[in-house]
Amino acid sequence: LLNFFGQWNSLAKCHAVNMNSGSFFRLHRDAYKTNQQMRIFIPLNKTELHEWAFIYDKDIAPFKAGTPYLLNTKKQHGSFAFVNDIYHVLMGIYINPHNFRVVTDLLPNCEDYE
């Protein structure tokens, strides 16, 4: 994970979240009032549906632990914990040429259009 975090040059925020059974993030949309941002979400453990559920744009979204996901959090999203000791990383990354290049390099099927 350290190599992953070191790639970005402008973080808006980055924090780890711990969820326990019964905790949740209500359905909401993120608003970017000043600077445009990308949201990267990294579930670290317990991503099976009987452990934790993530609702994204009215659907239950499947996630793989340890995999970073780029999310459009202007779409409605939220999550619900059914077991204890769930850990995730949430990152807000400012959109700039460097960070955009990092994203395109990380995406397996992204083509470069200049």
PLM feature spans:
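Signature of the catalytic double-stranded beta-helix
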Residues: 1-23
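Conserved metal-binding segment of the jelly-roll/cupin
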Residues: 61-76
